[in-house]
Regions:
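Phosphate-binding loop of NTP-binding sites
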Residues: 77-135
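N-terminal leader/targeting and accessory segments in enzymes
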Residues: 1-80, 84
Length: 135
């Protein structure tokens, strides 16, 4: 099933985001049950439900009265679903990559400067610094 089709089926729940920390769960949030080295997100379903979550993303069917999206790989599905919830913002990005032996940082900063002068929002990711284009 495509993510957009799934979101259409979830429309009655008013989904606005997805979280994997039960303390951030609430109405409109899908709670993703991620298994970690020390904790299992499935153990926190009740806490998420108490905070108002009505949809969970898990890797097996659980005995709870909650809408369940059951997938093999919760982590991978969560990322793709989060992108779909946010209308796939990555599809609207233009990315410029600079490679080579010398001059990459200088070229990146000059390119950024030109784009900013043209009022084109621009971020920059480098070895030691990153700018998101907002701050």
């Amino acid at each position: 099933m495509k993510y957009e089709a799934l979101l259409h089926r979830l429309k009655p729940f008013g989904i606005t985001g997805i979280v994997y920390d039960s303390r951030e769960a609430g109405p409109g949030k899908i709670f993703a049950c991620i298994r970690g080295e020390h904790c299992d997100g499935h153990d926190y379903i009740d806490a998420a439900l108490q905070r108002g979550t009505r949809v969970i993303l898990c890797d097996h069917i659980v005995e709870k009265d909650v809408y369940q999206i059951v997938v093999k790989d919760v982590r991978a599905f969560m990322g793709e679903l989060a992108a779909a919830i946010c209308n796939n913002p990555d599809e609207q990005l233009l990315m410029i990559g600079i490679t080579g032996t010398n001059g990459k940082t200088t070229s990146a900063y000059i390119t950024r400067s030109i784009l900013q002068a043209a009022d084109i929002p621009c971020g920059l990711i480098g070895t030691v610094v990153y700018h998101d284009g907002l701050r």
